[in-house]
């Protein structure tokens, strides 16, 4: 799977975005030899399993200029770095408690010249700030995740959709989401035809500001 996969689903990519996504693969392959943040199997399918998967969030919600997005448990930078490439006028804060993963985030961001990415090597519960949307990729079950990010949603809505969580998940979520009646599930197979996305979803959960 190559860069053509991204062009297929995002035909409006600018030359600068295409250049960054191209360089992204080189940077991750290089850094993954030093610090294993992506499995050996997945690194060969980086565009499909990590980059395009991250961009599934964009199919559900794009971010307006000036918005602030928090990526919780970012690992080596997913979904935050691909989202930051797509939204150069939005601010992305990427947090992870594991220092070596944040090292990769910093090096990749610097290598791409991404000025809209800030990293934090700490637990999300210790992070101060309010965000329009909080994104992540299956780092915990929803009740735990909601507890982690409580109090981090911005008061004002700058998008048509209310501020909240955009969570990349997979499988049967009926039990996990039974207490969240306002949650909405978007099937990524509705947007991407590859088999990998058959069970993949974006869960949107609106959240209220708690001052």
Swiss-Prot record:
Gene Ontology MF terms: rRNA (guanine-N7-)-methyltransferase activity
Principal subcellular localisation of the protein: cytoplasm
EC code(s) of this entry: 2.1.1.-
GO cellular component assignments: cytosol
Keywords annotated in UniProt: Cytoplasm, Methyltransferase, rRNA processing, S-adenosyl-L-methionine, Transferase
The organism's place on the tree of life at top rank: Bacteria
Binding site for S-adenosyl-L-methionine: 73, 78, 124-125, 137
Family annotation (CDD domains): AdoMet_MTases
Protein family: Belongs to the methyltransferase superfamily. RNA methyltransferase RsmG family.
Protein purpose: Specifically methylates the N7 position of a guanine in 16S rRNA.
NCBIfam families per the UniProt record, alphabetical: rsmG_gidB
PANTHER family xref list: S-ADENOSYL-L-METHIONINE-DEPENDENT METHYLTRANSFERASES SUPERFAMILY PROTEIN
UniProt-recorded name of the protein: Ribosomal RNA small subunit methyltransferase G
Species lineage: Bacteria, Pseudomonadati, Bacteroidota, Flavobacteriia, Flavobacteriales
Gene transcribed to yield this protein: rsmG
């Amino acid at each position: 799977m190559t860069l053509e996969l991204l062009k297929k689903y995002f035909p409006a990519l600018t030359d600068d975005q295409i250049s960054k996504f191209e360089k992204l693969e080189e940077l991750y392959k290089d850094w993954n030899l030093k610090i294993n943040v992506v499995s050996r199997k997945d690194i060969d399918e980086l565009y499909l399993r990590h980059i395009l998967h991250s961009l599934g969030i964009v199919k559900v919600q794009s971010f307006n200029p000036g918005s602030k997005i928090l990526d919780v448990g970012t690992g080596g930078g997913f979904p935050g770095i691909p989202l930051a490439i797509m939204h150069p006028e939005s601010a992305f804060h990427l947090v992870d408690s594991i220092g070596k993963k944040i090292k990769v985030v910093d090096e990749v961001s610097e290598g791409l010249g991404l000025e809209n990415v800030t990293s934090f090597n700490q637990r999300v519960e210790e992070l101060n700030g309010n965000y329009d949307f909080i994104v992540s990729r299956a780092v915990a079950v929803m009740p735990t995740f909601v507890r982690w990010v409580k109090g981090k949603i911005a008061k004002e809505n700058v998008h048509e959709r209310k501020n909240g969580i955009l969570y990349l998940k997979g499988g049967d979520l009926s039990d996990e989401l039974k207490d969240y009646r306002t949650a909405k599930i978007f099937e990524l197979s509705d947007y991407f035809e590859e088999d990998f996305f058959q069970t993949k979803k974006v869960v949107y959960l609106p959240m209220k500001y708690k001052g």
